[in-house]
């Protein structure tokens, strides 16, 4: 086995272990933020939505800068620094009793993510061969789902005692992850050339096809982020207990572990990437519309199942398509910019979703936010169809397995 092949094989295992630690650290804390501050402390949902939206926008919106710096200086220092910064954000969140302190903790957490997320994504593109990326992204997403359940279960159990224990556990996991990277991650370059920060950013911004694709995905993310805000609140409201939230993530894990990899393997040779992405988005949009009209957990969990199935169809195609469009000379910059759609869509989804949720309650129209999200999903579906029409998009970009 050549040294390059050996590095790729070892790199796969490193990426999987690293991803599990990051997912556990994140999901111990973040699914419980809305429960803690809205249900336990009585804050307005929009106040928590601002905090979650700020974290999302800082982490993803500034990702191009984190990616460009990583292109210049390498992945390791950025990843280690970012993970320690996120640990500091979680520690601060544990003592937050005013909105400004929660916002500051989410700002720190998001800034840490800005530093470590783009280089971690670029490492996947660097180490995994193009024909294997779709399946590897599916494995990562299966791991994300399992980690989300374990993290949410652990966080829910700790929340019975003290929210500070929840935040301390998340902080410790990110400190462990930083030490793991500092010890084992080689000083790999992310790009084929040592791209100056400004040059990497220029390459991305001049790629109109990539920029359009990323911005179009903002509508997709407005729906996707509700698993952190409105869906947990809805489950808690109907069940009357935050303990029920863990079953929402258990559903996601079961569906992902049983369906994600088989669907990805089956569809990658039969359907174009944009068709898989659009099909998943359509299922997600349809499942959102009736949520505000349900009256029991069985109905709600059925719709959540449909939502997760849509995500299972869409996510591997979205990640694979983003990676396939990245310029090898500026991988970090491209993968950083690819998060901008999540920054915009996530921020609007959190803040707008929280505002609409409060508005729906005030007007006794609980279906209002869910109807609006469904409409946004349909508009995004049409926009993607227009962008990826045969007349506008080179065929080789969208081939099955590309």
Curated annotation (Swiss-Prot):
<feature type="topological domain" description="Cytoplasmic">
    <location>
        <begin position="1"/>
        <end position="12"/>
    </location>
</feature>
<feature type="transmembrane region" description="Helical">
    <location>
        <begin position="368"/>
        <end position="388"/>
    </location>
</feature>
<keyword id="KW-0812">Transmembrane</keyword>
<feature type="topological domain" description="Periplasmic">
    <location>
        <begin position="160"/>
        <end position="164"/>
    </location>
</feature>
<feature type="transmembrane region" description="Helical">
    <location>
        <begin position="244"/>
        <end position="264"/>
    </location>
</feature>
<dbReference type="GO" id="GO:0005886">
    <property type="term" value="C:plasma membrane"/>
</dbReference>
<dbReference type="GO" id="GO:0022857">
    <property type="term" value="F:transmembrane transporter activity"/>
</dbReference>
<feature type="transmembrane region" description="Helical">
    <location>
        <begin position="300"/>
        <end position="320"/>
    </location>
</feature>
<keyword id="KW-0472">Membrane</keyword>
<dbReference type="InterPro" id="IPR036259">
    <property type="entry name" value="MFS_trans_sf"/>
</dbReference>
<dbReference type="InterPro" id="IPR050171">
    <property type="entry name" value="MFS_Transporters"/>
</dbReference>
<feature type="topological domain" description="Periplasmic">
    <location>
        <begin position="361"/>
        <end position="367"/>
    </location>
</feature>
<dbReference type="InterPro" id="IPR020846">
    <property type="entry name" value="MFS_dom"/>
</dbReference>
<feature type="transmembrane region" description="Helical">
    <location>
        <begin position="13"/>
        <end position="33"/>
    </location>
</feature>
<feature type="transmembrane region" description="Helical">
    <location>
        <begin position="139"/>
        <end position="159"/>
    </location>
</feature>
<comment type="similarity">
    <text>Belongs to the major facilitator superfamily. DHA1 family. MdtH (TC 2.A.1.2.21) subfamily.</text>
</comment>
<feature type="topological domain" description="Cytoplasmic">
    <location>
        <begin position="117"/>
        <end position="138"/>
    </location>
</feature>
<keyword id="KW-1133">Transmembrane helix</keyword>
<keyword id="KW-0813">Transport</keyword>
<feature type="topological domain" description="Cytoplasmic">
    <location>
        <begin position="321"/>
        <end position="339"/>
    </location>
</feature>
<feature type="transmembrane region" description="Helical">
    <location>
        <begin position="277"/>
        <end position="297"/>
    </location>
</feature>
<feature type="transmembrane region" description="Helical">
    <location>
        <begin position="214"/>
        <end position="234"/>
    </location>
</feature>
<feature type="topological domain" description="Periplasmic">
    <location>
        <begin position="235"/>
        <end position="243"/>
    </location>
</feature>
<feature type="topological domain" description="Periplasmic">
    <location>
        <begin position="34"/>
        <end position="98"/>
    </location>
</feature>
<dbReference type="Pfam" id="PF07690">
    <property type="entry name" value="MFS_1"/>
</dbReference>
<feature type="topological domain" description="Cytoplasmic">
    <location>
        <begin position="265"/>
        <end position="276"/>
    </location>
</feature>
<feature type="topological domain" description="Cytoplasmic">
    <location>
        <begin position="186"/>
        <end position="213"/>
    </location>
</feature>
<feature type="transmembrane region" description="Helical">
    <location>
        <begin position="99"/>
        <end position="116"/>
    </location>
</feature>
<feature type="transmembrane region" description="Helical">
    <location>
        <begin position="340"/>
        <end position="360"/>
    </location>
</feature>
<feature type="topological domain" description="Periplasmic">
    <location>
        <begin position="298"/>
        <end position="299"/>
    </location>
</feature>
<keyword id="KW-1003">Cell membrane</keyword>
<protein>
    <recommendedName>
        <fullName>Multidrug resistance protein MdtH</fullName>
    </recommendedName>
</protein>
<dbReference type="InterPro" id="IPR022855">
    <property type="entry name" value="Multidrug-R_MdtH"/>
</dbReference>
<dbReference type="InterPro" id="IPR011701">
    <property type="entry name" value="MFS"/>
</dbReference>
<feature type="topological domain" description="Cytoplasmic">
    <location>
        <begin position="389"/>
        <end position="402"/>
    </location>
</feature>
<keyword id="KW-0997">Cell inner membrane</keyword>
<feature type="transmembrane region" description="Helical">
    <location>
        <begin position="165"/>
        <end position="185"/>
    </location>
</feature>
């Amino acid at each position: 086995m050549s040294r390059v092949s050996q590095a790729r094989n070892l790199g796969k295992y490193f990426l999987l272990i690293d991803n599990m630690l990051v997912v556990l650290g994140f999901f111990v804390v973040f699914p419980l933020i809305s429960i803690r501050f809205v249900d336990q402390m009585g804050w307005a949902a929009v106040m928590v939505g601002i905090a979650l939206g700020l974290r999302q926008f800082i982490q993803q919106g500034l990702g191009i800068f984190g990616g460009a710096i990583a292109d210049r200086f390498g992945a390791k220092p950025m990843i280690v620094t970012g993970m320690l910064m996120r640990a500091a954000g979680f520690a601060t969140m544990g003592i937050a009793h005013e909105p400004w302190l929660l916002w500051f903790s989410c700002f720190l957490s998001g800034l840490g993510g800005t530093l470590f997320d783009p280089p971690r994504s670029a490492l996947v593109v660097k180490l995994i061969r193009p024909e294997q990326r779709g399946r590897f992204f599916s494995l990562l997403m299966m791991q994300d789902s399992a980690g989300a359940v374990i993290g949410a279960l652990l966080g829910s159990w700790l929340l019975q005692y003290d929210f500070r224990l929840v935040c301390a556990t998340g902080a410790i996991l990110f400190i462990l992850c930083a030490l793991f990277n500092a010890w084992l991650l080689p000083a790999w370059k992310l790009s084929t050339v040592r791209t100056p920060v400004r040059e990497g950013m220029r390459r991305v911004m001049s790629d109109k096809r990539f920029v359009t694709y990323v911005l179009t995905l903002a509508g997709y993310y407005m729906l996707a982020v509700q698993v952190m805000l409105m869906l947990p609140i809805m489950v808690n409201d109907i069940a009357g207990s935050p303990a029920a939230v863990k079953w929402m993530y258990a559903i996601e894990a079961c569906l992902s572990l049983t369906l994600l990899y088989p669907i990805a393997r089956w569809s990658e040779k039969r359907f174009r990437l944009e068709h898989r992405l659009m099909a998943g988005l359509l299922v997600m949009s349809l499942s959102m519309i009736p949520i505000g009209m349900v009256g029991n957990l069985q109905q709600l969990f059925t719709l959540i199942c449909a939502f997760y199935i849509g995500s299972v169809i869409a996510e591997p195609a979205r990640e694979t398509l983003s990676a396939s469009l990245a310029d090898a000379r500026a991988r970090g910059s491209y993968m950083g910019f690819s998060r901008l759609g999540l920054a915009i869509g996530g921020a609007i989804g959190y803040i707008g979703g929280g505002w609409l949720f409060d508005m729906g309650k005030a007007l006794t129209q609980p279906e209002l936010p869910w109807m609006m999200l469904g409409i946004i999903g349909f508009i995004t579906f049409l926009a993607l169809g227009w962008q990826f029409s045969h007349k506008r998009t080179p065929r080789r970009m969208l081939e099955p397995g590309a």
